[in-house]
């Protein structure tokens, strides 16, 4: 990490001041990639998932936990075989998603649940593809899963499903929110968010004009509320103060009443704001209908060319992290804060 002329060595994870951006003393030594972060409801524990085997010279198999007050590694140490890509935590349970095949020596298929002490529970939904996103419903009666699967517990659910938080069995949910194609195209939910009433999903499609946009649905039934069909995959979404924010490489929102195809010089919009009521594009941070070019924006970066990969909030600000090197054409690498 680099801050105001000084370099700070960190191993796959670090922390910075939310007000200044200066790196803190939190510097665990993790020997592999970090793919997911989640706080316990009381914000005392930070769960870290990814593809690693050691933390601070102690064995931790793809999942670890730290005390936020001290930065110290806890005794939470379930042994997960497979990369942990998504985490959702309650006060007593931790739900895991990713490319999971076993936990504590017992078979699991892409998703699992452990207690806060690391003990494996009986919760074991069966999926035929990896899990990229997990969200606990506002009333805590459902777990929503998004990812590259076509079936949940043997029933057809394309890229998005809903299961019971205790039994892992399917809850009533409408298939088809993520479109099903029969021509080689495929779409999957990459990110989930909620405003306390509806659930929002962002999607990534593979193939020409496959669904890349966002949608909203009712948590009790899965009934579609709205769908925004902007083209250009959505990496992350976050709801904050009446606005649904989206990190993507959107390059054509004409079908959603926004900007048309960007040609001849393909330069997507990496940051967008949407109305959570109907999915229409907004001006950044407001509830008014947007002009075609929302601001701010990032570039795509030098590795993936996709820009933002993750959003977070302290309730007031939006933090964006990803593979970008500029914000509004000014140098800002990998992490930015917006008021």
What are these regions (language model features)?
Residues 1-339:
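Extracytoplasmic surface signature
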């Amino acid at each position: 990490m680099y801050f105001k002329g000084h370099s700070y060595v960190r191993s796959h994870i670090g922390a910075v001041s939310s007000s200044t951006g200066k790196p803190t003393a939190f510097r665990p030594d993790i020997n592999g990639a970090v793919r997911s972060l989640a706080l316990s409801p009381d914000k005392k524990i930070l769960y870290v998932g990814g593809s690693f085997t050691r933390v601070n010279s102690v064995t931790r198999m793809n999942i670890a936990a730290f005390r936020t007050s001290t930065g110290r590694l806890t005794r939470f140490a379930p042994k997960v075989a497979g990369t942990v890509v998504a985490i959702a935590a309650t006060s007593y349970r931790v739900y895991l998603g990713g490319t999971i095949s076993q936990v504590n020596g017992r078979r699991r298929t892409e998703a699992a649940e452990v207690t806060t002490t690391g003990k494996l529970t009986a919760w074991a939904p069966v999926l035929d593809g990896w899990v990229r996103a997990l969200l606990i419903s506002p009333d805590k009666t459902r777990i929503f899963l998004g990812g590259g699967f076509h079936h949940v517990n043997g029933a057809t659910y394309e890229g998005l499903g809903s299961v019971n938080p205790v039994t892992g069995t399917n809850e009533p949910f409408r298939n088809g929110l993520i479109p099903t194609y029969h021509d080689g195209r495929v779409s999957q939910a990459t990110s989930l968010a909620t405003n306390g009433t509806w659930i929002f999903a962002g999607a990534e499609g593979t193939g020409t004009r496959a669904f890349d946009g966002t949608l909203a649905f009712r948590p009790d039934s899965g009934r579609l509320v709205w769908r925004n069909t902007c083209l250009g995959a959505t990496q992350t979404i976050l709801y904050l103060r009446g606005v649904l924010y989206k990190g993507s490489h959107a390059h054509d929102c004409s079908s959603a009443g926004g900007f048309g195809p960007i040609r001849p010089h393909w330069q997507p919009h990496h940051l967008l704001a949407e109305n959570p009521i109907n999915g229409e594009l907004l001006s950044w941070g407001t509830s008014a209908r947007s002009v075609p070019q929302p601001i701010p924006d990032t570039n795509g970066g030098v590795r993936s060319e996709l820009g933002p990969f993750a959003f977070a909030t302290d309730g007031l600000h939006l933090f964006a992290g990803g593979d970008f090197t500029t914000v509004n054409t000014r140098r800002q690498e990998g992490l930015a804060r917006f008021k």
